[in-house]
A protein has these predicted regions:
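Charge-rich, low-complexity N-terminal segments
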Residues: 1-46, 52-113
Length: 113
């Protein structure tokens, strides 16, 4: 698959996963997820879904067993919403970039005071 098509698939998955979390997920642990990026493997067998926690930090990230159960539920929802030959297996990966950036920003503000 061409890289342009992979980029389109990544964008589609990002939008669909975000929409599913907003509209269909009942578990409050996942309502604060902010999907940052999706990276699909070149063979389309898997995708890493990078997320952050809105107004949270790493201690707010659900345990791996919940993330695995969550990813299979989201994958089946994506399969029912989007016409794809094969929906990649999803792996949710916590991205703490925003949290780290806020920490650095707070540190810089405290130095200026």
């Amino acid at each position: 698959m061409t890289s342009n098509r992979i980029l389109q698939l990544e964008d589609l998955l990002k939008r669909e996963i975000s929409q599913i979390i907003l509209s269909k997920v009942k578990d409050d642990r996942f309502k604060s997820f902010n999907i940052i990026d999706v990276k699909v493997a070149s063979d389309l067998s898997s995708a890493k879904v990078y997320f952050s926690i809105i107004n949270g930090n790493e201690s707010d990230v659900p345990e791996i067993k919940f993330l695995e159960k969550f990813s299979s539920m989201i994958r089946s929802q994506v399969a029912s919403e989007v016409v794809l030959k094969k929906v990649p297996k999803l792996k949710f990966v916590y991205d703490n970039t925003l949290y780290e950036a806020n920490s650095i920003d707070d540190l810089l503000k405290s130095l200026n005071e």
